[in-house]
């Protein structure tokens, strides 16, 4: 295939990954006909959080990023100067909207279908057949290439080994952080937050402004980086007694008078719309019982290209990364793979890419590896150039962990001050 060949590309999802793919392909392969399928009525993916219709959405009212805007920006598209160093969810959505208007909206080669759900994707002869459904009809369309950009924040990951937990969920005493919106429900209540990732730390801290007591339950309490004085770090939960409102920890300690348990325990990868044979190859046997979801992915070259059919790819599957610039870098790789300018390895251990969580600092190695792949082939005039991870950005990334710890200390002090004033939580004044 050459850059002048007319081909059809489907992008499933209108969040950061889908938008980045549309920008990169429309610039690099202008003869491609691109169709974007967006389940929501607007772009943004998880960052689209209409406050009047927030039920079922991942975001919460007072959320800010855990990565600075200096790292998050797309190639050649900086944030506005007045945006805080750690942008709010609203700042991010406005940034994505501006990105969409600048690079995607009103482009002749790009069609976007809002409020349209992809219900089935299957290989039919030499093309991919997509079945999609909007409010009026069901449609089938054929494409040469497909990029799955549906994200991985739809199926909550919850523990299955805590005795008695089902009754807590049945009585709305336990829920996943996906359903957290703000702290008001916890006023003068005793709450356990399970997990100390970014969301777990942030939610626990926000709760201290109104809750009577906040516990943070994690595997290794001694390693907890939460600096909030109003949060007590405890061991993992062994069992939960709804009748007595008590929780027994793995060290034998019993916590009494518990009102709520919030699980900030992450999400499964889930692709229920992909035909079963392909889904099995990508998700493995799964862990949730419905074969639609899994904690790991398989048979993906460089965490994105389906090795058994390189006309199918997945964008932004890795976690603990800098997603916006990575999405454009991955899309630039996909361009070359789809054009057959960049060969992929199709014979390797299918479990080799099972985990997509990068340990601290390892994401930089991944960016460098992808950039090296791009540099290994001739780049054509007009091709998209993604963010290059130079020394400045590498230093910013390496310092981002301690920078965020310092930010968390400030947020904890802010929450303590609000509690003394008996004021509800809100984000502190922006620092740009």
From Swiss-Prot:
An example molecular function term from Gene Ontology annotations: N,N-dimethylaniline monooxygenase activity
InterPro entries: FAD/NAD-bd_sf (IPR036188), Flavin_mOase (IPR000960), Flavin_mOase-like (IPR020946), FMO-like (IPR050346)
Entry's EC annotation: 1.14.13.-
Keywords: FAD, Flavoprotein, Monooxygenase, NADP, Oxidoreductase
CC terms in the record's Gene Ontology section: cytosol; endoplasmic reticulum membrane
Family, as annotated: Belongs to the FMO family.
Protein name as it appears in the record: Thiol-specific monooxygenase
Highest classification ranks of the organism: Eukaryota, Fungi, Dikarya, Ascomycota, Saccharomycotina
């Amino acid at each position: 295939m050459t850059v002048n060949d007319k081909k059809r590309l489907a992008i499933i999802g209108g969040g950061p990954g889908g938008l980045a793919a549309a920008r990169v392909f429309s610039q690099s392969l202008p003869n491609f006909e691109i169709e974007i399928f967006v389940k929501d009525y607007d772009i943004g993916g998880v960052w689209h959080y209409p406050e009047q219709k927030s039920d079922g959405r991942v975001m919460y009212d007072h959320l800010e990023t855990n990565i600075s805007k200096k790292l998050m920006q797309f190639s050649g598209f900086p944030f506005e100067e007045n945006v805080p160093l750690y942008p709010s969810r609203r700042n991010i959505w406005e940034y994505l909207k501006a990105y969409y208007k600048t690079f995607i909206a009103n482009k002749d080669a790009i069609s976007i279908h809002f409020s349209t759900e992809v219900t089935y994707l299957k290989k039919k002869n030499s093309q991919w057949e997509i079945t999609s459904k909007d409010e009026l009809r069901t449609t089938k369309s054929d494409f040469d290439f497909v990029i799955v950009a549906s994200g991985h924040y739809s199926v909550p990951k919850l523990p299955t080994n805590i005795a008695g937990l089902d009754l807590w969920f049945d009585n709305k005493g336990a829920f996943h952080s996906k359903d957290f919106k703000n702290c008001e429900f916890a006023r003068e209540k005793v709450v356990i937050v399970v997990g100390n990732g970014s969301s777990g730390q942030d939610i626990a801290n926000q709760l201290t402004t109104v809750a009577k007591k906040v516990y943070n339950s994690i595997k290794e309490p001694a390693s907890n980086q939460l600096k909030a004085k109003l949060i007590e770090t405890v061991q993992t939960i062994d069992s939960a007694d709804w009748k007595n409102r008590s929780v027994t920890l793995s060290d034998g300690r019993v916590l009494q008078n518990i009102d709520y348990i919030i699980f900030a325990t992450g999400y499964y990868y889930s692709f229920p719309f992909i035909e079963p044979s392909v889904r099995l190859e990508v998700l493995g046997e799964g862990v949730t019982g419905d074969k639609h979801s899994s904690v790991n992915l398989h048979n993906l070259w460089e965490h994105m290209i389906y090795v058994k059919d390189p006309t199918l790819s997945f964008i932004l599957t890795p976690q603990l990364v800098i997603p916006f610039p990575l999405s454009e870098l991955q899309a630039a790789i996909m361009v070359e793979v789809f054009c057959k300018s960049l060969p992929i390895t199709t014979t390797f251990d299918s479990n080799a890419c099972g985990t997509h969580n990068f340990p601290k600092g390892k994401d930089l190695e991944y960016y460098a590896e992808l950039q090296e792949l791009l540099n290994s082939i001739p780049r054509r005039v007009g091709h998209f150039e993604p963010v290059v991870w130079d020394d400045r950005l590498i230093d910013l990334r390496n310092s981002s962990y301690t920078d965020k710890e310092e930010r968390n200390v400030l947020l904890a002090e802010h929450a303590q001050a609000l509690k003394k004033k008996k004021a509800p939580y809100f984000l502190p004044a922006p620092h740009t």
